[in-house]
């Protein structure tokens, strides 16, 4: 027993083993990303900042069915519908989302029959004041216009699983 301990101490086997382990990890590719400059690929199902979409002809998609308002567990969505138009359809006059209350569950997106409200790919929407987290219809439509290409691609990629 003493001879075994003396050999370990003399040849520094534990030190050499630890050194070799360190060298193995030293030369492997780094798993850490330099975030602002490097980003992980996002899933098509990523739930980020909300957006209201428009049809390709420019007409907004929301038909004021209020399913998203009804299903929201945080009660973060407020909708007011305008009067029926000549063709029998409705559109919203007010569409507000309180992003402070929102829990990003995605129920609003799943409930929408026309894919009007979606949670887009944007994860970087920090603000300086709490009031900026109250999104009105104009802000949501602006988000939809900004992210429409990626949103449409993500919906198409996710279509087989819906």
Swiss-Prot record:
Cross-referenced Gene3D superfamilies: 3.30.70.3270
Keyword Disulfide bond applies: no
Subcellular location: Cell inner membrane
Enzyme Commission code: 7.1.1.-
Cofactor binding, note field: Binds 2 [4Fe-4S] clusters per subunit.
Alphabetical list of InterPro entries matching this protein: 4Fe4S_Fe-S-bd, 4Fe4S_Fe_S_CS, NADH_quinone_OxRdtase_chainI
Catalysed reactions, semicolon-separated: a quinone + NADH + 5 H(+)(in) = a quinol + NAD(+) + 4 H(+)(out)
A GO BP annotation: aerobic respiration
Binding sites annotated in the UniProt record for [4Fe-4S] cluster 2: 72, 102, 105, 108
Domain 4Fe-4S ferredoxin-type: 52-82, 93-122
Pfam family membership, one: Fer4_7
Topology of this chain in the membrane: Peripheral membrane protein
Binding site for [4Fe-4S] cluster 1: 62, 65, 68, 112
A GO molecular function held by the record: iron ion binding
Keyword field: 4Fe-4S, Cell inner membrane, Cell membrane, Iron, Iron-sulfur, Membrane, Metal-binding, NAD, Quinone, Repeat, Translocase, Ubiquinone
Gene Ontology cellular component terms for the protein in this record: plasma membrane
SUPFAM superfamilies, per the entry: 4Fe-4S ferredoxins
Cofactors named for this entry: [4Fe-4S] cluster
Stated family: Belongs to the complex I 23 kDa subunit family.
Task performed by this protein: NDH-1 shuttles electrons from NADH, via FMN and iron-sulfur (Fe-S) centers, to quinones in the respiratory chain. The immediate electron acceptor for the enzyme in this species is believed to be ubiquinone. Couples the redox reaction to proton translocation (for every two electrons transferred, four hydrogen ions are translocated across the cytoplasmic membrane), and thus conserves the redox energy in a proton gradient.
Subunit structure: NDH-1 is composed of 14 different subunits. Subunits NuoA, H, J, K, L, M, N constitute the membrane sector of the complex.
Protein name listed in UniProt: NADH-quinone oxidoreductase subunit I
Organism name: Methylocella silvestris (strain DSM 15510 / CIP 108128 / LMG 27833 / NCIMB 13906 / BL2)
Taxon lineage: Bacteria, Pseudomonadati, Pseudomonadota, Alphaproteobacteria, Hyphomicrobiales
Gene (UniProt): nuoI
């Amino acid at each position: 027993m003493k001879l075994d301990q003396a050999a370990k101490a003399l040849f520094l086997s534990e030190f050499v083993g630890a050194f070799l382990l360190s060298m193995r990890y030293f030369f492997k590719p780094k798993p850490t990303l330099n975030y602002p400059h490097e980003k992980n690929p996002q899933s098509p199902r990523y739930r980020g900042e909300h957006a209201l979409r428009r049809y390709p002809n420019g007409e907004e998609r929301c038909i004021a069915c209020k399913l998203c308002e009804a299903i929201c567990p945080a009660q973060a969505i407020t909708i007011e519908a305008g009067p029926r138009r000549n063709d029998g359809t409705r559109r919203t006059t007010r569409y507000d989302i309180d992003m402070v209350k929102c829990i990003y569950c995605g129920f609003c997106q799943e409930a929408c029959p026309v894919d009007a409200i979606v949670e887009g790919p944007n994860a970087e929407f920090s603000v300086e004041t709490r009031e900026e987290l109250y999104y009105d219809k104009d802000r949501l439509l602006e988000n939809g216009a900004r992210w429409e290409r990626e949103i449409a691609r993500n919906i198409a990629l996710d279509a087989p699983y819906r």
